[in-house]
């Protein structure tokens, strides 16, 4: 197969960075198609840990480098900070390609994000306040500033003046906040444009040319299916399409070009921010999972909400994202546990259901129906093959695959690239 998409099948933070790094060593290029620096990913290579929010994970191994597609919203300051850190560690970034159609996060987007969240009080969404939502709002309103605009002084000046007039009216009259100054932004972002110029191109052409040559292309999704603007737990979602269908529009290619869609999940479930979470654990078991797995946000540092594995949510993700392979991470967390639970269905107002409700009110009333499985005592962090896994670990994995209806291709037993058990090579599916 020449085109593999990796998508989060839960609420993000599933460990997509690890599997994309693992797969990218055989890829010609790694491509990111949505989101911005609200989506943190951690890569561990040897004794080095890389925490990134914008640059694709495949920058470390893909033969022709990494691509940032038109569906991504770019904070130039964050991007260049990451690139500088990578260069200091000896990582070759010369193969980076940035879409000329990608939208740029401006200072007023970050402020708007912050002011809106503050104004909502108890009804806040729980955004990372990085300006992602307001940037996508401007994109949909057709007033956004794109990467190509930063390369044209007159175009950028006109758009920035127009947008600042609107944003400053909002800030001063609605939020009672100070106005932003044109001169504090204009030259700084023009300079970003010039610094970015050597990487900027029509990435749709780059990616489609690679696919036409039957080169292996790895598509990296950001966040997770349950945060998709259409298919997730709306309004507690992100501002972009995180399902595999969003990859096509976020790159500029036909949806039929994807061969395999790998859904990445944890052996349990986590969520950051507000919103329904049927299997959430608010007890010492949840605390134990959180501390064992170091479940704190890469971007915010916030403790993640923790719950048991939810096969109802996974089946929803499978259907809407076209997932046909599963990559499960953090199996090692359950070593030493007595038992593990899997939600096989929900109970809603006394009735058993096997679907994921659209209504928030219904979701908040849903109670998980659990199936209990025995855990294992063995340390599995050095296990390399399926055969060497404890029998109870195999039973758990088989049950997950059976309930979701998708075969497992990889199982992770630790953070390092080498701590990955490959059941089937996705490039050969």
From Swiss-Prot:
Q: Where does GTP bind?
A: 12-18, 40-42, 304, 330-332, 412-414
Kindly list the places in or outside the cell where this protein is found, as annotated in its UniProt entry: Cytoplasm
SUPFAM superfamilies attached to this UniProt entry: P-loop containing nucleoside triphosphate hydrolases
* GO molecular function terms attached to this record: adenylosuccinate synthase activity; GTP binding; magnesium ion binding
Q: Which InterPro entries match?
A: Adenylosuccin_syn_GTP-bd, Adenylosuccin_syn_Lys_AS, Adenylosuccinate_synth_dom1, Adenylosuccinate_synth_dom2, Adenylosuccinate_synth_dom3, Adenylosuccinate_synthetase, P-loop_NTPase
**Keyword field contains Metal-binding:** yes
Q: Where is the active site?
A: 13 (proton acceptor), 41 (proton donor)
Binding sites annotated in the UniProt record for Mg(2+): 13, 40
Tell me which EC number(s) this protein carries.
6.3.4.4
One GO biological process from the UniProt record?
Answer: 'de novo' AMP biosynthetic process
Q: Which family is annotated?
A: Belongs to the adenylosuccinate synthetase family.
Instruction: State its role.
Output: Plays an important role in the de novo pathway of purine nucleotide biosynthesis. Catalyzes the first committed step in the biosynthesis of AMP from IMP.
- Subunit comment for this entry? Homodimer.
From the Swiss-Prot or TrEMBL record, give the protein name: Adenylosuccinate synthetase
What is the source species?
A: Lactobacillus gasseri (strain ATCC 33323 / DSM 20243 / BCRC 14619 / CIP 102991 / JCM 1131 / KCTC 3163 / NCIMB 11718 / NCTC 13722 / AM63)
- State the organism's lineage: Bacteria, Bacillati, Bacillota, Bacilli, Lactobacillales
């Amino acid at each position: 197969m020449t085109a593999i998409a990796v998508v989060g099948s839960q609420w993000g933070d599933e460990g997509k960075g690890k599997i994309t790094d693992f797969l990218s060593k055989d890829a010609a290029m790694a491509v990111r198609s949505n989101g911005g620096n609200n989506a943190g990913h951690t890569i561990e290579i040897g004794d080095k840990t890389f925490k990134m929010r914008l640059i694709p994970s495949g920058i470390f191994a893909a033969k022709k480098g990494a691509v940032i597609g038109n569906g991504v919203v770019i904070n130039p300051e964050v991007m260049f900070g990451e690139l500088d850190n990578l260069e200091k560690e000896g990582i070759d970034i010369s193969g980076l390609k940035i879409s000329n159609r990608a939208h740029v996060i401006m200072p007023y987007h970050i402020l708007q994000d912050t002011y809106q969240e503050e104004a909502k009080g108890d009804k806040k969404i729980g955004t990372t306040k990085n300006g992602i939502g307001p940037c996508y709002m401007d994109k949909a309103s057709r007033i956004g500033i794109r990467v190509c605009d930063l390369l044209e002084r007159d175009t950028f000046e006109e758009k920035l003046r127009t947008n600042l007039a609107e944003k400053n009216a909002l800030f001063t009259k609605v939020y009672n906040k100070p106005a932003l100054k044109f001169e504090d932004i204009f030259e700084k972002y023009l300079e970003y444009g010039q610094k970015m110029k050597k990487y900027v191109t029509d990435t749709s052409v780059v990616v489609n040319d690679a696919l036409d040559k039957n080169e292996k292309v790895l598509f990296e999704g950001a966040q997770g299916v349950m945060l998709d603007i259409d298919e997730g737990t709306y309004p507690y979602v992100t501002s972009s399409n995180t399902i595999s269908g969003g990859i096509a529009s976020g790159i500029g290619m036909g949806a039929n070009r994807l061969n395999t869609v790998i859904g990445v999940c944890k052996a349990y479930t986590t969520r950051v921010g507000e919103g329904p979470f049927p299997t959430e654990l608010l007890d010492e078991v949840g605390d134990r999972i959180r501390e064992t797995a170091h479940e704190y946000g890469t971007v915010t540092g916030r403790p993640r909400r923790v719950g048991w594995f939810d096969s109802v949510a996974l089946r929803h993700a499978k259907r809407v994202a076209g997932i046909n392979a599963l990559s499960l991470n953090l199996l090692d967390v359950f070593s030493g546990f007595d038992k593990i639970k899997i939600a096989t269905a929900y109970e809603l107002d006394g009735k058993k259901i096997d679907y994921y409700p659209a209504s928030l009110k219904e979701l908040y009333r849903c109670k998980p129906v659990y199936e209990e499985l025995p855990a294992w005592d063995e340390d599995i962090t050095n296990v390399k093959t399926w055969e060497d896994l404890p029998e109870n670990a195999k039973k758990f994995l088989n049950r997950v695959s059976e309930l979701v209806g998708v075969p497992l291709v990889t199982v992770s037993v630790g953070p390092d690239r080498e701590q990955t058990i490959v059941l089937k090579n996705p490039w050969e599916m």
